[in-house]
Amino acid sequence: MRGPLIVLVALAVLAWLSWEVMQRRAPQEIPASAAPDSAGSGVRAVRLYFASPNGDSLVAETRELVEPATFHDRVATLVAELDRGPRGRGVAALPAGTAVLHVYMDDRGLLTLDVSGAFRRGFHGGSTAEYLAIASLVRTLGANLPEVRRVLIVCAGRPLATLGGHLPLDRPLEVSDWP
């Protein structure tokens, strides 16, 4: 008699736990009208640049994103969105898996951007693909971070002479040169 009672209690507990789990939903995507987050930043529109479908230029895409609290997180969020690729027309220009490791910003507008090794390892293209990858990154950062005037790209903590052999990356890139 004791065995069936234990099974019945166990089933009741399991049913209660299942009901509790079902009541807690996964977080929903934040609507554009969301209230500010705990840092007071809220949601803002960002402009991302992707390769055009025919691969000869960049196309802009606007997204509503939660504004991160720190500068590092703002940069990391922009790069992560580029890595996710476009929602509309266009093609991701960054090598897949590119992520921000570190960000250094000086008082003269120089952003030193340390990206993961996937940036270099994942690149398999020619001069146009290289241009589009760098332009996508620099234009997106410049469009959304007005304090950034120049970008120096570093890969996994080491200087990067070039991505694909065509564009020099061993010196800072002027944002204004990538309109």
Name the predicted role of every residue range.
Residues 1-179:
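Bimodal "functional hotspot" detector
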